[in-house]
Amino acid sequence: MELILGSQSSARANLLKEHGIEFEQKALYFDEESLKTTDPREFVYLACKGKLEKAKELLANNRTIVVADSVVSVGNRMQRKAKNRQEAFEFLKRQNGHEIEVLTCSALISPALEWLDLSVFRARLKAFDPSEMEKYLESGLWQESAGCVRLEDFHKPYIKSLSENLSVGLGLNVEGLLGVLKLGAKLSSL
């Protein structure tokens, strides 16, 4: 079985590597701007479904394709990827000292199986150090992440408490995916 990660996300690729999952990474283009909803859960679900439909075009020769999408919600206000430094600053200002939710919709499609999961990761944050926030904004690393949230580096020292499903916060429900891959292997051996 050949696994394709339909995402350019380095965080998602790293999650698969950390779990010993071999894959090929391919970008799938889906126009998220076509989605008009401002509800974070609906948005991430529709974006993932759109990517899943694009993935079906690649589905052949015993391939399994994984796609995902994430958004951040602060007080039920959606934060996608910041368009510029000012928007990134506004996102971080809203997160500062508050609870954030990372909503991740993960999906898999194979000749034998289709799976879709919407999960939420929560973290309560301490106040950001203003000079560290400025360095982060200057670095440009925020450009890669929904809501400018990078749990693996910038946000890490500011986490007061978090839910257990860190992989969801990093952009892919790996625990769920591992279970589905095992199920897929059993189904294909029947």
Curated annotation (Swiss-Prot):
The catalytic activity of this protein is classed by the Enzyme Commission as 3.6.1.9
Q: Identify which residues the record assigns to the active site.
A: 69
Q: Which reaction does it catalyse?
A: a ribonucleoside 5'-triphosphate + H2O = a ribonucleoside 5'-phosphate + diphosphate + H(+); a 2'-deoxyribonucleoside 5'-triphosphate + H2O = a 2'-deoxyribonucleoside 5'-phosphate + diphosphate + H(+)
Any single Gene Ontology cellular-component annotation = cytoplasm
Q: Name one GO biological process term.
A: nucleotide metabolic process
| One Pfam family cited in the UniProt record for this chain | Maf
Required cofactor names: a divalent metal cation
Q: Which UniProt keywords apply?
A: Cytoplasm, Hydrolase, Nucleotide metabolism
InterPro entries per the UniProt record, alphabetical: ITPase-like_fam, Maf-like
**GO MF annotation: an example:** nucleoside triphosphate diphosphatase activity
* Domain of life of the native organism: Bacteria
Location in or out of the cell:
Cytoplasm
Q: Does the keyword Cytoplasm apply?
A: yes
Q: Does the keyword section mention Amino-acid biosynthesis?
A: no
Q: Which SUPFAM superfamilies match?
A: ITPase-like
Task: Extract the HAMAP family matched here.
Answer: Maf
Q: Which NCBIfam families match?
A: maf, PRK04056.1
The similarity comment for this entry is: Belongs to the Maf family.
Q: What does this protein do?
A: Nucleoside triphosphate pyrophosphatase. May have a dual role in cell division arrest and in preventing the incorporation of modified nucleotides into cellular nucleic acids.
Q: What is this protein called?
A: Nucleoside triphosphate pyrophosphatase
| Record organism | Helicobacter pylori (strain Shi470)
